[in-house]
Amino acid sequence: MASAQLDYTIEIPDQPCRSQENSPDQGGKEAGTRLPLVILLGWGGCSDKNLAKYSAIYHKRGCIVIRYTAPWHMVFFSETLGIPSLRVLAQKLLELLFDYEVEKEPLLFHVFSNAGVMLYRYVLELLQTHQRFCHLRVVGTIFDSGPGDSNLLGALRALAVVLEHRPAALRLLLLVAFTLVAFLFHVLLAPLTALFHTHFYDRLLDAASRWPELYLYSRADEVVLARDVERMVEARLAHQVLVRSVDFVSSAHVSHLRDYPTYYTTLCINFMHSCVHCSGPCPPHLTSAPEINA
């Protein structure tokens, strides 16, 4: 079983997942279309405690939630070297749906930073190519603070945060090693690397998925540049994907919920409901959120 080989958390509500449509017959209780099972893919080095704050947005509304964060060494080193180790983890993650017999539930992904996007990239590939997973039904994806294109300085900032509690000598060694590897494989040997490994950002630009996407980012983000997210939004729109994007303007990397809890939660919940009712109007495209009072 995949569950025995993956460090994940699953939260299953007592009540079945239903969309928030008040029914007179039920005294205002939730009824109607089933809400999606939500899969949270955490940012590099984030703790389950931190990810649980996002999980609560969905779980308290009756959603099954799975949260998982890929090991930081795979994110920063394996992917940089072009080693697709995360593909194995992506497959185990999808196999959890069959282990818990929830593979027929609609799925919503909530993906954080480039670490989450790197894993999500392989999820997309498996959904398209793996016979067991091709019938899974994804209804939407939320991107928080990502995806970003090659930004060595931003990646170093992210890795420094991951390593902040490590001994100083080890931290310095790993930062130098990452810098050398990234520069070698993505600058000096970029044409050679491209022959056997496509960068996750480039893969997502032309992804075959067509379900709605919500991008939550900030021009104040020093890890993932706002222009990278905006370029992704334009590319997805060009592929006729229903996209909404919100610029939080002042919040730092993966800090939008912390700085604007009410507004962030409302955006996620409204997007989730629009995805499960995709036959109706889907969320419009926005480029910024000029008024944030949450």
UniProtKB/Swiss-Prot annotation:
UniProt entry keywords in alphabetical sequence: Membrane, Nucleus, Transmembrane, Transmembrane helix
Subcellular locations according to the entry: Nucleus outer membrane
GO biological process: negative regulation of BMP signaling pathway; negative regulation of ossification; negative regulation of osteoblast differentiation; regulation of nucleocytoplasmic transport
Nucleus as UniProt keyword: yes
Domain of life of the native organism: Eukaryota
A cellular component annotation (GO) from this entry: nuclear outer membrane
Its membrane topology: Single-pass membrane protein
TM region positions: 172-192
Stored InterPro entries: AB_hydrolase_fold (IPR029058), DUF829_TMEM53 (IPR008547)
Role summary: Ensures normal bone formation, through the negative regulation of bone morphogenetic protein (BMP) signaling in osteoblast lineage cells by blocking cytoplasm-nucleus translocation of phosphorylated SMAD1/5/9 proteins.
Family the entry assigns: Belongs to the TMEM53 family.
PANTHER family given in the database record: TRANSMEMBRANE PROTEIN 53
Protein name, entry field: Transmembrane protein 53
Origin species: Bos taurus
High-level lineage: Eukaryota, Metazoa, Chordata, Craniata, Vertebrata
